[in-house]
Curated annotation (Swiss-Prot):
InterPro entries: RsmH, SAM-dep_MeTrfase_MraW_recog, SAM-dependent_MTases_sf. This is Ribosomal RNA small subunit methyltransferase H. GO terms for biological process: rRNA base methylation. Its main location: cytoplasm. It comes from Thermosipho melanesiensis (strain DSM 12029 / CIP 104789 / BI429).
């Protein structure tokens, strides 16, 4: 296990419990098990329900297994929510009572040494949520064309200096570490732009590359389609997003669906929660019911 000392705190815990868990003798799916924070709450609140918890990250599932060992109603599996129909079929399950997804990067992935998600440490460029997949941040930064890099950084990072950054990336290849990438981004941006940004100047580019590595937005669309098919009548879908690109997809899908009814959201964390868990500050929860 990698060096990792942070304690994970699930985002919007009370709200997830309130809106997702509408019956105790159901089947609930946590599509992003992570360290097991939300899964723990679901299993504890609904002891007569089956809880299927999946994640693509084998390392984080090891932590979840320890955190959830007291529960006999939880099944932990290494799988992507893109493949949820196959996962449930293998368990003999046709319909479920609730589906939860806490999107984006996990605390473990950001803080554990050597995963390459953070611009605050010097690590090999990686950013894979599933460490068994081939495509990594190193592959994208070193082998994508300047045009393709520019499109990704603009589209997924909403970075208006995408062309300048892409040009510098190609010019400074090979790029092997997060620190090298940060310095290249810094070189590409006007000094005045760096000074006026509230967040770290590399945030947008790192987000864009991470989304491309893990096909995050494409996968969210598939998750929503899966949920629409797999939820029983009255079943709940709860999605926590952390940036506008994710939230927009969820919002529009629910709005345009003939089978889902919007029942809550966007629900944002209270001031007290963001004080205790700064990661929660940009979280938005949207909830829909299968009709």
């Amino acid at each position: 296990m990698r060096k990792y000392n942070d304690k994970h705190i699930p985002v919007l815990p009370n709200e997830v419990v309130e809106y997702l868990l509408w019956k105790d003798n159901g089947i609930y799916v946590d599509c992003t098990a992570g360290e097991g924070g939300h899964t723990f709450l679901i299993a504890k609140k609904c002891p007569n329900s089956r809880v299927i918890a999946i994640d693509v990250d084998l390392e984080v599932l090891e932590i979840a297994q320890k955190n959830l060992k007291a529960f006999h109603n939880v099944i932990l599996l290494k799988a992507s929510y893109v493949d949820l129909p196959v996962v449930l079929k293998s368990l003999g399950i046709e319909r479920v009572s609730g589906i939860l997804a806490d999107l984006g990067i996990s605390t473990y992935q950001l803080k554990a040494e050597g995963r390459g998600f953070s611009f605050n440490r010097d690590e090999p460029l990686d950013m894979r949520m599933d460490i068994q997949q081939d495509t990594s941040a190193h592959k994208i930064t070193n082998f994508y064309s300047e045009e393709k890099l520019s499109k990704i950084i603009f589209k997924y990072g909403e970075e208006r200096f995408a062309r300048r950054i892409a040009k510098q990336i190609v010019k400074n290849r090979p790029i092997n570490t997060t620190k090298e990438l940060v310095e290249i981004i810094k070189k590409a941006l006007p000094p005045s732009e760096i000074r006026k940004r509230k967040r770290h100047f590399a945030t947008k580019t790192f987000q864009a590359i991470r989304i491309e590595v893990n096909k995050e937005l494409k996968n969210i669309e598939q998750l929503l389609k899966n949920a629409e098919e797999l939820l029983e009548i009255g079943g709940r879908l709860a999605i926590i997003s952390f940036h506008s690109l994710e939230d927009r997809i969820v919002k529009h899908f629910i709005k345009n669906s003939n089978n889902l009814k919007h029942i809550a959201g966007p629900i944002k964390p209270t001031q007290e929660e963001t004080k205790n868990n700064p990661r929660a500050r940009s979280a938005k929860l949207r909830v829909a019911e299968r009709i």
